[in-house]
């Protein structure tokens, strides 16, 4: 979740900042000078939308290191560190990707993979994960993160986010133009965008951005199922990944009901924004997988 949450927040911030800068540079005035130029607006929205997503992707690795306090390791330290690096290398070779950077950070059980390119990524695990799981479970979690890299999930999410951003920028400015035109309908001397346009577009950039995040989060949840399956393939069996998920969920595999029903850890709006499916659904998907 940390990996995608950082990406989404960075992306939203970049889009809002770019929108404000565009207003200050007079781009909005150009678009509305003689009525709204939809063709120019669509091009502007595309550049803004994908620009924000690509900048977020390129910044994802350094931001993740900084925000999580990741300490990069090379396997020359403790025996545990050497094992982590060897495990990442083994899975990277199996998956056909370049060796990622490997790091450790302080905190509760967690792990993430990030980076703009498959051959220049980062896999980081927390001290809580190393202390609270068996080696086999940690190995499964590492396999899950390597699978994210091999599947190209960060690039895929960037493309999806770029499309969402484009719609957000386009719609917010069309609605902003309509609101501004209505507010100044009796002002014959008005020219260019007014305060109604600027306020509406900034507010809608934020509101529609959060709504778009629901769609991005849905796609992210589907990628998690694929990464779980990828970890099982790298491990050669499903049980280690099932055990790791059960450990993360605070339950022992033997205590799981035979017919797991799909139920969310958090209901309502929280589940819509969640980048990960409920643990129970992920375990059930692995248990029901063929092969």
Swiss-Prot record:
The free-text note explaining how the cofactor binds reads: Binds 1 zinc ion per subunit.
EC assignment:
3.4.24.-
Q: Where does Zn(2+) bind?
A: 144, 148, 224
TM stretches of this protein: 4-24, 38-58, 159-179, 199-219
Q: Which UniProt keywords apply?
A: Cell inner membrane, Cell membrane, Hydrolase, Membrane, Metal-binding, Metalloprotease, Protease, Transmembrane, Transmembrane helix, Zinc
GO cellular-component terms in the record? Answer: plasma membrane
Q: Which cofactor does it need?
A: Zn(2+)
Give the UniProt family note. Belongs to the peptidase M48B family.
Query: Active-site positions, per UniProt?
Result: 145
Instruction: Specify the superkingdom.
Output: Bacteria
Q: Which InterPro entries match?
A: HtpX_protease, Pept_M48_protease_HtpX, Peptidase_M48
- An example of a Pfam family matching this protein is Peptidase_M48
The record's Gene Ontology biological-process terms are: proteolysis
Question: What is its subcellular localisation?
Answer: Cell inner membrane
The membrane topology term of the UniProt record is: Multi-pass membrane protein
One MF term in GO for this entry? zinc ion binding
Q: What is its main location?
A: membrane
Q: What is the protein named?
A: Protease HtpX homolog
Gene3D superfamilies found in the cross-reference section = Metalloproteases ('zincins'), catalytic domain (3.30.2010.10)
């Amino acid at each position: 979740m940390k990996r995608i949450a950082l990406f989404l927040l960075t992306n939203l911030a970049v889009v809002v900042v770019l929108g404000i800068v565009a207003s200050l540079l007079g781009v909005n005035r150009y678009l509305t000078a003689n009525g709204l130029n939809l063709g120019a607006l669509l091009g502007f929205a595309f550049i803004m939308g994908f620009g924000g997503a690509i900048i977020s992707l390129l910044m994802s690795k350094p931001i993740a290191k900084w925000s999580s306090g990741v300490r990069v390791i090379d396997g020359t330290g403790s025996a545990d560190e050497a094992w982590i690096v060897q495990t990442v290398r083994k899975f990277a070779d199996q998956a056909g990707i370049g060796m990622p950077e490997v790091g450790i950070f302080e905190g509760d059980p967690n792990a993430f993979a990030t980076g703009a390119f498959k051959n220049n990524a980062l896999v980081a695990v927390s001290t809580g994960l190393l202390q609270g799981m068996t080696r086999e479970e940690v190995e499964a979690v590492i396999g899950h993160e390597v699978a994210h890299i091999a599947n190209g999930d960060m690039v895929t999410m960037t493309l999806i986010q770029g499309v969402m951003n484009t719609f957000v920028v386009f719609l917010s400015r069309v609605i902003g133009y309509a609101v501004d035109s209505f507010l100044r309908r009796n002002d014959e001397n008005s020219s260019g965008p007014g305060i109604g346009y600027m306020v509406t577009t900034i507010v809608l950039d934020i509101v529609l951005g959060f709504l778009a995040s629901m769609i991005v989060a849905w796609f992210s949840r589907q990628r998690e199922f694929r990464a779980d399956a990828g970890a099982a393939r790298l491990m050669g069996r499903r049980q280690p990944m099932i055990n790791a998920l059960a450990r993360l969920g605070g339950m022992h595999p033997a205590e799981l009901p035979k017919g797991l029903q799909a139920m969310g850890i958090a209901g309502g709006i929280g589940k819509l924004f969640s980048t990960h499916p409920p643990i129970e659904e992920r375990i059930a998907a692995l248990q029901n997988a063929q092969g």
